[in-house]
Design a protein with these regions (language model features):
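Short alpha-helical scaffolding segments that buttress acidic/His motifs in well-ordered protein cores
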Residues: 18-21, 35-39, 83, 87-90
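Alpha-helix boundary/capping and short turn/kink residues
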Residues: 7-11, 29-30, 47, 58, ...
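Hydrophobic/aromatic-rich alpha-helical bundle segments in the mid-to-C-terminal region
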Residues: 49-55, 69-121
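Hydrophobic alpha-helical connector segments
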Residues: 2-29, 70, 76, 80-83
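An amphipathic alpha-helix signature
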Residues: 15, 58-61, 65, 107, ...
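Amphipathic alpha-helical segments used for helix-helix packing
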Residues: 13, 27-47
């Protein structure tokens, strides 16, 4: 399920990120990302919590980077971090505004990255 559901190449799977986020944001029990929330609400010197959050972010970015590499990105790590910023921003905006449309806005911003990736591949 998720990114690997159905047909499509790596770029298509990357594009699936944002509709999946939109589905998550539309759930009644969406309260944002527990990792972002935990860092925001706890002692900034809490290294254990930060380490757990960083490990989660690395896993997410690693999955995105592997798809970016498969798609032929010139700099898969950079693309993963760019998409990660859009993802995290959409999560925070959706949490604050209660508007699942934040995922669509992030998808529109990501589209220029995907178009450049398709042109270079």
């Amino acid at each position: 399920a998720g990114l690997d559901a159905g047909e499509g190449g790596a770029v298509e799977r990357l594009r699936r990120i944002f509709p999946l986020l939109g589905d998550w944001f539309a759930q009644d029990r969406f309260y944002g990302c527990p990792f972002i929330n935990a860092i925001g609400e706890h002692d900034k010197a809490e290294d254990r919590l930060r380490a757990i959050t960083i490990a989660h972010k690395k896993a997410v970015l690693g999955r995105i980077e592997s798809l970016a590499m498969e798609a032929g990105a010139h700099d898969p790590n950079r693309l993963a971090h760019q998409l990660g910023l859009l993802i995290d921003g959409a999560i925070v905006v959706a949490m604050i505004s209660r508007d699942p449309g934040a995922a669509r806005l992030a998808a529109e911003a990501a589209e220029s990255l995907f178009a450049a990736l398709e042109r270079s591949a």
